[in-house]
Amino acid sequence: MQAPLQQLFDRGSLWLGNQPNHAADQASFVTTGQLELDQALGGGWQSQRLHEIQVPQFFVGELALVAPALMRATQQKRPIFWLSPPAVPYAPALAQLPLAESERQQAQHIVLTPSRPADALWAAETILHSGQAGVLLLWAEQPSAIAIRRLHLAAAESGAYVFILSPWQAEEARSYATRLRVHLSQDSVTGNGQVQWQLLKRTGGWPLRLARQALPKWPGK
């Protein structure tokens, strides 16, 4: 006999479309630095999952969303891998992260710039299978569904926070835990830049858009 629906909900075997799924271990989450986004994601970024951040152009505040994950990796003495970034990571900004001096000195940032997209995907998969990474950031223009599936499986074994940063992509089924699209606009009164988060996919909830807000700031500024 099937268990009553309520028992299935209580065990976390089922979820309601308008409610986040809290069955996951909260210790595996790290904040995005944005309260409403954390709530929509059930706690923030989850480790051992593949998260996509789609941007209309790079460096519009998206790195502020992953800064807390960089801090956690540093505190855990695990290296941070930057794969095919569009620019060299800005060392003075990384030095501003609110870490203890001993933690800051032991930070490991490894930048790899493969010449071909296929090599970058191979490097990402290899790094994740090694189990050494704390965070992996991969910039990819149009990764294939097969490549994403392979990275999804590798991320599940890695213990790392894994992010794919890309231009806007087609809204087709992909093996991501999170698909976040960044929309930019200006406040009609002040003229200041604003951002709106659109979650195309999230664990334990339907897609949604959050209210517009000011561009996120890098921690320590």
Residue ranges and their predicted role:
Residues 1-82, 86, 93-106, 201-205, ...:
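Detector for small/aliphatic-rich hydrophobic stretches
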Residues 61, 119, 146:
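Residues that form or flank phosphate/diphosphate-binding pockets in enzymes
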Residues 65-69, 123, 147-151, 155:
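A short acidic, amphipathic alpha-helical/loop segment
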Residues 79-143:
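Long, charge-dense
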Residues 98-101, 128, 154, 174, ...:
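Short, hinge-like loop/turn segments at secondary-structure boundaries
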Residues 122-123, 147-150, 175-176, 209-211:
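A short secondary-structure junction signal
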Residues 128-173:
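A contiguous pocket-lining binding segment that forms or flanks enzyme active sites
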Residues 166-221:
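Phosphate-binding/switch region of NTP-binding enzymes
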